[in-house]
Amino acid sequence: MNPTLNILGISGSLRAQSRNTGLLRFAKQCLPPTVNFQIADLSDVPFYNADRCDSKPEPVQTLIRQVTEADALVLACPEYNYSIAPALKNALDWVSREPDCAPFNGKPVAIMGAGGGMGTSRAQYHL
């Protein structure tokens, strides 16, 4: 049996009917059974606050654990006001505060997005 590849999808949108979360769900359906694809839930991740870094809230601890355990990341990034969606930026801020950005080290990251007009190109550029 092939080893399992663990991929974590992170959507920058908190909307229930998000196109970007839908894009992650579609990607999950396209993968073989040897790939474990989870989608992180950012809905309860509070705004980053440096004063809370020593006692991270449970949703933040869960996110850090998911990123750490993943072999690769897929970021689905909507574009809000010509830049990165706040929920995604906030999640990246929390995880990047770990010593030496350890959860991200050595991980391949794919970036995708769904949107009208210019799509999500400007947000992807900022990432």
Segments and roles (model prediction):
Residues N2-T34:
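N-terminal beta1-alpha1 ligand-phosphate binding loop
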Residues M1-N2, P103:
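Short, flexible hinge/linker loops that cap or flank conserved catalytic cores
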